[in-house]
Amino acid sequence: MVPRAAGGRLYSDTMGRLTFILFLIYSLPVGMHHLLMDPEHGNATKFIQVLLTAFVSVPTLLTIFTITASLEIAGRLRGGRGLFGWIAALPWERPMVLATGLAFVMLGFGDFGGMINMGYDMNAMVHNTSWVTAHFHLIFGGSVVIMYFAIAYDIWPRLTGRDHPSLSLLRLQLWLWCIGMMVMTLPWHWLGLQGQWRRVANRHAPRGRLRGDNAGTQASAVAGRV
């Protein structure tokens, strides 16, 4: 969808299919690195999660390369010259292209935080702090959700047969989402380095309430996986 919106073509269909398969293999259980230092997880499990996090960085980089190469093709077809001239030649007024660029910005910060979470030593500095919260908000709430918006903008006219009343409003919404995520998460990173807690048990939980909370947590986990 992104290459088509930019006026180009996909750089490599094979690489796109390969990254999809690698993500299916490596990324489904990899979110446990957000809990890497929690004592209920054994050392073997933690080691496996570190490996999976390292492995999932490969299809992530392949995806970034493929999309960037596809956008470069589109930019050069539109007359872009020089090493970076193709970037300015892209149709940034189109919501799908703009969302991709903003997603890359948030993905860069989010991936950097993920690499910190991956390491035993560096993870010990930021575990259970707002750094971790900032990381996964940038990855999912930032780069993933903004692309959901762009896909919805692209699909809606095809489903309804009606054009959007204003592309300016769509672009404004994308910019506001990106700016809002950055304003929220960058201070979280800094506060995490200062030791701001992510989770804290600051009240007594009666046994009955605890059982109810556990049941709700397990139901949410099953529903989320489904």
Features from the language model and the residues they span:
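Hydrophobic cores of alpha-helical transmembrane segments in multi-pass integral membrane proteins
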Residues: M1-A6, D13-L36, Q49-I73, R94-Y120, ...
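Membrane-interface helix caps and helix-loop-helix hairpins in membrane proteins
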Residues: L35-A44
